[in-house]
Amino acid sequence: MKQVEERYISLLTDFGFKRIFGSAPNKDLLICFLNSLFNGRQVVMDVKYLNPENVGDIYTDRKAIFDVYCEGENGEKFIVEMQNAYQTYFKDRALFYSTFPIREQAPKGNEWDFKLNHIYTIALLNFNMNEEAFNKEEIRHHVQLCDTATHKIFYDKLEFIYVEIAKFNKSLDELETLYDKWLYALKNLYKLTQRPKALCDKVFDRLFEEAEIAKFTPQEQREYEASKMAYRDIKNSIDTAKRVGKEEGLAEGMEKGLAEGMKKGLAEGVEKGLAEGMEKGLAEGMEKGMNKRNLEIARKMLANGMDAATVMEITGLSESQLQQLKG
């Protein structure tokens, strides 16, 4: 079967996401998406794009590179991230990222009353987070500091919004709200060969115009292809890690289960060993497979001329690991 050539970019790729939401000429698209996400809780009238690369303090010199970083008209800060692969300490990373817009609000000098502007960290997740605190039936999760006894909001100016777009499975006929339409576009734009009636709202005029690959310059096409290759490699590495992890977990579980079964009874031992072994083997196998595949992805991205900062952001590798690849 002949493969259909893509007409529109994938917003799941680093290039596609930043082209649509991270450039000043397209800020109306970002504003529209944010307002659909907030659904009246917060109204964004305008944004000013800020430098997405933030350097840590003199003690850590640790950098944070955001996909999109901008400021609202009232000084509120928005960090918007697209995440395609699960990371063990992803919650920690989101919290760490939020410290940068907090610290940069402190003026130079000694006089300051510590009043802070609102900070929103928005993470769009192309995977299921499997967070125990979340309602598994929901796609959007809103996190704030609250009193654990009263469940009342303790501090309302630091918010984390996680959107598990991997769970979004509505068809075009089922799209009801602007938020639905944005999630559909985020997940499925690259699959479309023509603009559907369900996405004929005026705000999407610019989306389809900016996303049409045929209008790209040769350089933009090369950058998109490199970004698409990195995205595919990441997804393939996840699939491989899952498969290897399951195989190793099954083998280890059977071995351990049989050994324990000799002592405690074959039926009980096999059942327990399989469960524990598969869980441990899956986790270790996925971690090992992901790390090896990420090194391969990084090597290809560097060979295609992508800068080190972007490679680290996409693959999760450290600067020292990249230096070893270059060496």
What are these regions, as identified by a protein language model?
Residues K2-E6, F78-Q83, D173, D180-G327:
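Short, charged alpha-helical interaction segments and adjacent helix-coil junctions
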Residues M1-Q221:
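Conserved single-residue anchors adjacent to enzymatic active/cofactor-binding motifs
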